[in-house]
Protein backbone atom coordinates (compact mmCIF):
# COMPACT_ATOMS: atom_id res chain seq x y z
CA UNK A 1 0.00 0.00 0.00
CA UNK A 2 1.13 3.56 -0.63
CA UNK A 3 0.19 4.60 2.89
CA UNK A 4 3.35 3.07 4.34
CA UNK A 5 6.01 0.81 2.88
CA UNK A 6 6.05 -1.45 5.94
CA UNK A 7 2.26 -1.86 6.11
CA UNK A 8 0.94 -4.96 4.36
CA UNK A 9 -2.57 -5.28 5.84
CA UNK A 10 -5.12 -4.13 3.26
CA UNK A 11 -8.27 -5.28 5.06
CA UNK A 12 -9.56 -6.26 8.48
CA UNK A 13 -11.75 -9.21 9.45
CA UNK A 14 -14.70 -8.42 11.72
CA UNK A 15 -15.89 -11.21 14.02
CA UNK A 16 -19.30 -9.58 14.50
CA UNK A 17 -21.60 -10.20 17.45
CA UNK A 18 -21.89 -13.99 17.31
CA UNK A 19 -20.70 -17.03 15.34
CA UNK A 20 -24.00 -18.89 15.73
CA UNK A 21 -25.79 -19.18 12.38
CA UNK A 22 -29.22 -19.19 14.03
CA UNK A 23 -28.40 -16.01 15.92
CA UNK A 24 -27.08 -14.42 12.72
CA UNK A 25 -30.52 -14.68 11.10
CA UNK A 26 -32.22 -13.45 14.27
CA UNK A 27 -29.82 -10.52 14.53
CA UNK A 28 -30.33 -9.70 10.84
CA UNK A 29 -34.09 -9.43 11.27
CA UNK A 30 -33.93 -7.65 14.62
CA UNK A 31 -31.34 -5.04 13.71
CA UNK A 32 -32.98 -4.42 10.33
CA UNK A 33 -36.17 -3.42 12.15
CA UNK A 34 -34.19 -1.31 14.63
CA UNK A 35 -32.30 0.51 11.86
CA UNK A 36 -35.53 1.31 10.03
CA UNK A 37 -36.88 2.62 13.34
CA UNK A 38 -33.81 4.84 13.79
CA UNK A 39 -34.13 6.36 10.33
CA UNK A 40 -37.91 6.85 10.47
CA UNK A 41 -37.94 8.16 14.06
CA UNK A 42 -35.21 10.74 13.57
CA UNK A 43 -36.43 11.65 10.08
CA UNK A 44 -39.91 12.24 11.50
CA UNK A 45 -38.53 14.72 14.03
CA UNK A 46 -36.47 16.46 11.32
CA UNK A 47 -39.47 16.83 9.01
CA UNK A 48 -41.81 17.88 11.83
CA UNK A 49 -39.48 20.58 13.16
CA UNK A 50 -38.70 21.84 9.64
CA UNK A 51 -42.27 22.20 8.43
CA UNK A 52 -44.13 23.14 11.62
CA UNK A 53 -43.76 26.87 12.27
CA UNK A 54 -44.70 26.45 15.94
CA UNK A 55 -41.50 24.44 16.44
CA UNK A 56 -39.20 27.05 14.92
CA UNK A 57 -37.55 27.79 18.26
CA UNK A 58 -33.95 27.38 19.49
CA UNK A 59 -34.74 24.19 21.45
CA UNK A 60 -36.24 22.39 18.46
CA UNK A 61 -33.53 23.66 16.13
CA UNK A 62 -30.95 21.94 18.34
CA UNK A 63 -33.17 18.86 18.69
CA UNK A 64 -33.44 18.50 14.90
CA UNK A 65 -29.65 18.65 14.63
CA UNK A 66 -29.35 15.97 17.33
CA UNK A 67 -31.70 13.76 15.31
CA UNK A 68 -29.61 14.37 12.20
CA UNK A 69 -26.40 13.36 13.99
CA UNK A 70 -28.04 10.27 15.50
CA UNK A 71 -29.34 9.15 12.12
CA UNK A 72 -25.95 9.58 10.42
CA UNK A 73 -24.06 8.04 13.36
CA UNK A 74 -26.12 4.86 13.17
CA UNK A 75 -25.68 4.72 9.40
CA UNK A 76 -21.90 4.36 9.50
CA UNK A 77 -21.80 0.96 11.20
CA UNK A 78 -25.31 -0.49 11.30
CA UNK A 79 -25.98 -1.18 7.57
CA UNK A 80 -22.69 -3.04 7.15
CA UNK A 81 -23.30 -4.99 10.35
CA UNK A 82 -26.74 -6.03 9.06
CA UNK A 83 -25.32 -7.16 5.70
CA UNK A 84 -22.47 -9.00 7.46
CA UNK A 85 -24.98 -11.14 9.35
CA UNK A 86 -25.61 -12.88 6.01
CA UNK A 87 -21.91 -13.24 5.14
CA UNK A 88 -19.58 -15.99 6.25
CA UNK A 89 -16.50 -13.80 5.83
CA UNK A 90 -16.89 -10.31 7.23
CA UNK A 91 -14.19 -7.93 5.99
CA UNK A 92 -13.61 -4.20 5.67
CA UNK A 93 -10.84 -2.40 3.77
CA UNK A 94 -8.18 -0.41 5.62
CA UNK A 95 -9.51 2.89 4.31
CA UNK A 96 -13.08 1.78 4.98
CA UNK A 97 -12.08 1.04 8.56
CA UNK A 98 -10.28 4.38 8.84
CA UNK A 99 -13.31 6.26 7.47
CA UNK A 100 -15.64 4.45 9.85
CA UNK A 101 -13.53 5.39 12.87
CA UNK A 102 -13.10 9.00 11.70
CA UNK A 103 -16.81 9.67 11.27
CA UNK A 104 -17.79 7.77 14.42
CA UNK A 105 -15.48 10.01 16.49
CA UNK A 106 -16.48 13.13 14.53
CA UNK A 107 -20.18 12.57 15.14
CA UNK A 108 -19.69 11.28 18.70
CA UNK A 109 -17.64 14.35 19.67
CA UNK A 110 -20.10 16.66 17.93
CA UNK A 111 -23.03 15.07 19.76
CA UNK A 112 -21.35 15.59 23.13
CA UNK A 113 -20.94 19.29 22.41
CA UNK A 114 -24.47 19.53 21.02
CA UNK A 115 -25.83 18.09 24.27
CA UNK A 116 -23.94 20.84 26.10
CA UNK A 117 -25.50 23.42 23.75
CA UNK A 118 -28.94 21.97 24.51
CA UNK A 119 -28.23 22.24 28.24
CA UNK A 120 -27.28 25.90 27.78
CA UNK A 121 -30.53 26.43 25.87
CA UNK A 122 -32.54 24.89 28.73
CA UNK A 123 -30.67 27.02 31.26
CA UNK A 124 -31.54 30.23 29.41
CA UNK A 125 -35.15 29.14 28.82
CA UNK A 126 -35.78 28.23 32.47
CA UNK A 127 -33.58 30.70 34.35
CA UNK A 128 -33.92 33.73 32.02
CA UNK A 129 -37.26 33.20 30.25
CA UNK A 130 -37.89 36.89 29.49
CA UNK A 131 -34.63 37.19 27.57
CA UNK A 132 -34.70 33.72 26.01
CA UNK A 133 -35.23 34.65 22.35
CA UNK A 134 -32.81 37.57 22.63
CA UNK A 135 -30.00 35.50 24.12
CA UNK A 136 -30.59 32.42 21.96
CA UNK A 137 -30.54 34.40 18.72
CA UNK A 138 -29.96 32.76 15.30
CA UNK A 139 -26.36 34.00 15.44
CA UNK A 140 -25.77 32.34 18.82
CA UNK A 141 -27.44 29.12 17.68
CA UNK A 142 -25.30 29.00 14.55
CA UNK A 143 -22.20 29.59 16.66
CA UNK A 144 -23.11 26.78 19.07
CA UNK A 145 -23.81 24.39 16.20
CA UNK A 146 -20.61 25.20 14.31
CA UNK A 147 -18.60 24.96 17.53
CA UNK A 148 -20.04 21.49 18.16
CA UNK A 149 -18.97 20.23 14.74
CA UNK A 150 -15.59 21.98 15.01
CA UNK A 151 -14.81 20.28 18.33
CA UNK A 152 -15.91 16.94 16.88
CA UNK A 153 -13.66 17.44 13.86
CA UNK A 154 -10.61 18.37 15.95
CA UNK A 155 -11.23 15.43 18.28
CA UNK A 156 -11.60 12.95 15.41
CA UNK A 157 -8.63 14.34 13.47
CA UNK A 158 -6.35 14.07 16.50
CA UNK A 159 -7.43 10.46 17.07
CA UNK A 160 -6.97 9.46 13.44
CA UNK A 161 -3.59 11.20 13.17
CA UNK A 162 -2.26 8.53 15.52
CA UNK A 163 -3.56 5.81 13.20
CA UNK A 164 -1.72 7.03 10.10
CA UNK A 165 1.65 6.41 11.74
CA UNK A 166 0.92 2.82 12.78
CA UNK A 167 2.30 -0.17 10.84
CA UNK A 168 -0.10 -3.11 10.31
CA UNK A 169 1.82 -6.13 9.11
CA UNK A 170 0.18 -9.23 10.56
CA UNK A 171 -2.90 -9.66 12.78
CA UNK A 172 -6.03 -8.20 11.20
CA UNK A 173 -8.93 -9.71 13.19
CA UNK A 174 -11.19 -7.28 15.08
CA UNK A 175 -13.47 -8.82 17.69
CA UNK A 176 -16.36 -6.46 17.04
CA UNK A 177 -18.97 -5.59 14.43
CA UNK A 178 -17.23 -2.34 13.44
CA UNK A 179 -13.78 -0.76 13.53
CA UNK A 180 -13.39 0.27 17.15
CA UNK A 181 -10.27 2.41 17.58
CA UNK A 182 -8.91 0.74 20.77
CA UNK A 183 -9.24 -2.71 19.15
CA UNK A 184 -7.60 -1.61 15.90
CA UNK A 185 -4.66 -0.04 17.72
CA UNK A 186 -3.93 -3.37 19.41
CA UNK A 187 -3.27 -4.93 15.98
CA UNK A 188 -0.36 -2.63 15.15
CA UNK A 189 3.10 -4.18 14.75
CA UNK A 190 4.71 -2.00 17.42
CA UNK A 191 4.40 -1.14 21.08
CA UNK A 192 1.27 1.01 21.36
CA UNK A 193 1.08 1.47 25.12
CA UNK A 194 1.79 5.22 24.98
CA UNK A 195 -0.57 5.61 22.05
CA UNK A 196 -3.32 3.81 23.94
CA UNK A 197 -2.92 6.26 26.80
CA UNK A 198 -3.09 9.22 24.40
CA UNK A 199 -6.27 7.88 22.81
CA UNK A 200 -7.88 7.38 26.22
CA UNK A 201 -6.75 10.84 27.36
CA UNK A 202 -8.10 12.50 24.21
CA UNK A 203 -11.55 10.92 24.39
CA UNK A 204 -11.63 10.97 28.18
CA UNK A 205 -10.82 14.68 28.40
CA UNK A 206 -13.54 15.64 25.93
CA UNK A 207 -16.08 13.40 27.67
CA UNK A 208 -15.13 14.69 31.12
CA UNK A 209 -15.29 18.37 30.14
CA UNK A 210 -18.69 17.94 28.46
CA UNK A 211 -20.04 15.89 31.36
CA UNK A 212 -18.92 18.46 33.94
CA UNK A 213 -20.46 21.30 31.91
CA UNK A 214 -23.71 19.35 31.76
CA UNK A 215 -23.65 18.65 35.50
CA UNK A 216 -23.10 22.33 36.29
CA UNK A 217 -25.85 23.43 33.89
CA UNK A 218 -28.40 20.95 35.21
CA UNK A 219 -27.43 21.68 38.81
CA UNK A 220 -28.04 25.41 38.35
CA UNK A 221 -31.33 24.74 36.54
CA UNK A 222 -32.65 22.37 39.22
CA UNK A 223 -31.64 24.79 41.99
CA UNK A 224 -33.44 27.61 40.18
CA UNK A 225 -36.59 25.62 39.45
CA UNK A 226 -37.02 24.68 43.12
CA UNK A 227 -38.05 28.25 43.88
CA UNK A 228 -40.53 28.63 41.03
CA UNK A 229 -44.29 28.14 41.06
CA UNK A 230 -45.40 24.50 41.08
CA UNK A 231 -47.02 24.63 37.62
CA UNK A 232 -44.00 26.24 36.00
CA UNK A 233 -41.65 23.87 37.84
CA UNK A 234 -43.60 20.86 36.61
CA UNK A 235 -43.33 21.97 32.98
CA UNK A 236 -39.65 22.86 33.36
CA UNK A 237 -38.80 19.52 34.95
CA UNK A 238 -40.75 17.68 32.26
CA UNK A 239 -38.60 19.28 29.56
CA UNK A 240 -35.41 18.93 31.56
CA UNK A 241 -36.00 15.26 32.42
CA UNK A 242 -35.94 14.32 28.73
CA UNK A 243 -32.55 16.00 28.31
CA UNK A 244 -31.12 14.34 31.42
CA UNK A 245 -32.36 10.92 30.25
CA UNK A 246 -30.72 11.37 26.84
CA UNK A 247 -27.46 12.56 28.41
CA UNK A 248 -27.42 9.54 30.74
CA UNK A 249 -28.01 7.12 27.86
CA UNK A 250 -25.22 8.76 25.87
CA UNK A 251 -22.53 9.02 28.53
CA UNK A 252 -23.13 5.77 30.45
CA UNK A 253 -21.70 3.53 27.68
CA UNK A 254 -18.82 5.98 27.16
CA UNK A 255 -17.76 5.57 30.78
CA UNK A 256 -17.49 1.78 30.50
CA UNK A 257 -15.92 1.83 27.03
CA UNK A 258 -13.15 4.25 27.99
CA UNK A 259 -12.56 3.12 31.59
CA UNK A 260 -11.86 -0.39 30.29
CA UNK A 261 -11.12 0.37 26.60
CA UNK A 262 -8.73 -2.50 25.91
CA UNK A 263 -10.52 -5.30 27.73
CA UNK A 264 -11.68 -8.46 26.01
CA UNK A 265 -14.99 -8.90 27.74
CA UNK A 266 -18.09 -9.40 25.60
CA UNK A 267 -19.76 -6.57 27.53
CA UNK A 268 -17.82 -4.18 25.28
CA UNK A 269 -19.82 -5.43 22.28
CA UNK A 270 -23.09 -4.90 24.13
CA UNK A 271 -22.10 -1.36 25.09
CA UNK A 272 -20.99 -0.61 21.53
CA UNK A 273 -24.34 -1.82 20.20
CA UNK A 274 -26.14 0.33 22.76
CA UNK A 275 -24.04 3.40 21.94
CA UNK A 276 -24.20 3.17 18.14
CA UNK A 277 -27.69 1.73 17.66
CA UNK A 278 -30.05 1.90 20.63
CA UNK A 279 -29.21 5.44 21.76
CA UNK A 280 -30.09 6.89 18.30
CA UNK A 281 -33.29 4.83 18.44
CA UNK A 282 -34.30 5.90 21.94
CA UNK A 283 -33.56 9.64 21.62
CA UNK A 284 -36.52 10.50 19.35
CA UNK A 285 -38.80 8.28 21.45
CA UNK A 286 -37.79 10.04 24.67
CA UNK A 287 -38.23 13.53 23.26
CA UNK A 288 -41.55 12.61 21.67
CA UNK A 289 -43.06 10.98 24.76
CA UNK A 290 -41.94 13.77 27.10
CA UNK A 291 -42.93 16.69 24.85
CA UNK A 292 -46.56 17.54 24.18
CA UNK A 293 -45.68 20.08 21.47
CA UNK A 294 -43.74 17.53 19.45
CA UNK A 295 -46.45 14.90 19.93
CA UNK A 296 -49.13 17.33 18.75
CA UNK A 297 -47.06 18.40 15.74
CA UNK A 298 -46.37 14.78 14.74
CA UNK A 299 -50.05 13.86 15.03
CA UNK A 300 -50.90 16.86 12.87
CA UNK A 301 -48.26 15.88 10.32
CA UNK A 302 -49.53 12.28 10.22
CA UNK A 303 -53.17 13.45 10.17
CA UNK A 304 -54.01 11.43 13.29
From Swiss-Prot:
Transmembrane segments: 26-49, 58-79, 101-120, 140-158, 196-219, 236-258, 270-289
Compartments, record wording: Cell membrane
Organismal lineage: Eukaryota, Metazoa, Chordata, Craniata, Vertebrata
PROSITE patterns for the chain: G_PROTEIN_RECEP_F1_1, G_PROTEIN_RECEP_F1_2
Residue spans, topological domain Cytoplasmic: 50-57, 121-139, 220-235, 290-304
Single GO cellular component term: plasma membrane
Function (record text): Odorant receptor.
Domain of life: Eukaryota
UniProt xrefs under InterPro entries: GPCR_Rhodpsn, GPCR_Rhodpsn_7TM, Olfact_rcpt, Olfactory_Receptors
Keywords of this entry: Cell membrane, Disulfide bond, G-protein coupled receptor, Glycoprotein, Membrane, Olfaction, Receptor, Sensory transduction, Transducer, Transmembrane, Transmembrane helix
Family, per entry: Belongs to the G-protein coupled receptor 1 family.
Organism listed in the record: Homo sapiens
Extracellular topological segments: 1-25, 80-100, 159-195, 259-269
Glycosylation sites: 5
GO molecular function: G protein-coupled receptor activity; olfactory receptor activity
Membrane topology label: Multi-pass membrane protein
Stored Pfam families: 7tm_4
Disulfide bonds: 97-189
Annotated protein name in UniProt: Olfactory receptor 4K13
Amino acid sequence: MERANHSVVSEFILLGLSKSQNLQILFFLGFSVVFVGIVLGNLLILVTVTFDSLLHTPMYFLLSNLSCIDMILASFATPKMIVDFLRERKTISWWGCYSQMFFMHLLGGSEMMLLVAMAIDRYVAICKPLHYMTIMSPRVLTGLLLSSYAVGFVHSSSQMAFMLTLPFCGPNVIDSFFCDLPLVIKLACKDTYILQLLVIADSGLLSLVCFLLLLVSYGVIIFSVRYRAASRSSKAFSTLSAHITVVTLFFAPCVFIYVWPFSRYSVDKILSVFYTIFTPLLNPIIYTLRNQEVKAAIKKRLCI
